[in-house]
């Protein structure tokens, strides 16, 4: 892997989980991936792989953690 590609993958996962939790628990906007138009295509590709690697049980688990932490 190239320099920073792994970080792009983890950034995609982290942003997807954050946006999903805020949408489902706090009534935030719908989750949408970052637009990588005009940037390094490889980093954009790894970001999207990270974004798409998040599954529903993981989202629900993070929603539960958010509720426990913030007493919602």
UniProtKB/Swiss-Prot annotation:
The stated induction of this gene product is:
Expressed in the intermediate phase of the viral replicative cycle.
Q: What is its main location?
A: host cell
> What do the Gene Ontology cellular component annotations say?
host cell cytoplasm
Compartments annotated for it: namely: Host cytoplasm
Keywords carried by this UniProt record = Host cytoplasm
- The superkingdom listed in its UniProt entry is Viruses
Q: What is this protein called?
A: Uncharacterized protein gp18
Q: Which organism is it from?
A: Escherichia phage Mu (Bacteriophage Mu)
């Amino acid at each position: 892997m190239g320099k920073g590609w792994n970080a792009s993958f983890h950034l995609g996962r982290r942003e997807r989980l954050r946006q999903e939790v805020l949408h489902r628990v706090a009534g935030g906007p719908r989750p949408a991936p970052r637009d990588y138009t005009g940037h390094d295509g490889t980093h954009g590709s790894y970001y999207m792989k990270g974004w798409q690697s998040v599954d529903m049980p993981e989202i629900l688990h993070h929603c539960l953690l958010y509720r426990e932490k913030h007493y919602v």
